[in-house]
Amino acid sequence: MIRRNPNGDLPAIHSNAFIDPTAIICGKVIVDRHVFIGPYAVIRADETDDHGNLHPIHIGEGTNIQDGVVMHSKDGGPISIGKHTSIAHRAIVHGPCQVGDRVFVGFNSVLFNCTIGDGCAIRHNAVIDGMTLPANFYIPSTSRIGPDTDITAFSESVSDTNLQLVQGYKRIQNEL
């Protein structure tokens, strides 16, 4: 369902985008070409700031918004989703948020008031709250990354774990 917000803004949807008929796209939303928006997704740009300002929700070319995703912005803040990004089933993107190009956001993950660099992978059931993630950063499933998280130490921990896994699997490689 495509509909106006209370300010009268209608979504601008490229003719080559696909919007499932069960999805709700409301207000100042810009959908670029070759975007897929799946069943029961809700994308609402309808809440203004104290001065009546409302920034758009912009979804970049080739991006895929899967079933049940919710995008909404507090006080009219912007949401920008880059090109060729995938937001998986039932994820929530609550703005203001900026998500780069070629990003993967796993199912049931929550992004709030954050900036996600190009090429990041955020696995399933993760929460990113009030943070800036550098390009190509990896967030494991069920992680919570907030303002008090030292992402340098976090990144080193993930690297150490991955190295241990590689060494362990190389050791048993011939048994597999």
Regions found by a protein language model. Name each.
Residues I2-A12, Y40, R44-D46, D50-P56, ...:
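Glycine-rich hexapeptide-repeat left-handed beta-helix
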Residues M1-Y40:
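N-terminal segments that cap or nucleate solenoid repeat domains
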